[in-house]
Structure formats: structure tokens, C-alpha cells
Curated annotation (Swiss-Prot):
Record organism: Bacillus phage PZA (Bacteriophage PZA)
Protein name per its UniProtKB record: Early protein GP1A
Keyword annotations from UniProtKB, A to Z: Early protein
């Protein structure tokens, strides 16, 4: 089962940047969060983890 990982970073004036990636497991998603470095001038704000939809979920 794949997961969509979305990480949000925010800077001092409130501009938000979004980083999207996929992970094969929840453990891989945690690894993505640990390795993530926010762009210069930004800091980590929050993340979202959701199941990736497949053709089998739609049927």
C-alpha cells in the first residue's frame, strides 16, 4: 500500500511551501519526514499522510 506524504514549510512572513512525495509504507513516510530539510528561510510547519488511491480502491 502506498502513502502520499505532503510536507508544509512556512517562512517568517507566512508564505507556505508544499512538498509532495510518495512512500511505500508508514515507515518509509517517517523516514521522509526525518530526512526532510526545509528550504532556506523556511521552517517545518506540518505534514499530512494519506493513502494513495489505486484502481482497486475506485472499483
Amino acid at each position: 500500500m502506498s502513502y502520499l506524504v505532503t510536507i508544509f514549510s512556512i517562512n517568517a512572513i507566512g508564505v507556505v511551501r508544499r512538498y509532495d512525495t510518495t512512500a511505500r509504507s508508514r515507515t518509509d513516510a517517517a523516514s521522509v519526514l526525518i530526512k526532510y530539510k526545509a528550504p532556506r528561510g523556511y521552517k517545518f510547519d506540518r505534514f499530512e499522510l494519506s493513502r494513495e488511491r489505486s484502481i482497486f480502491d475506485v472499483l
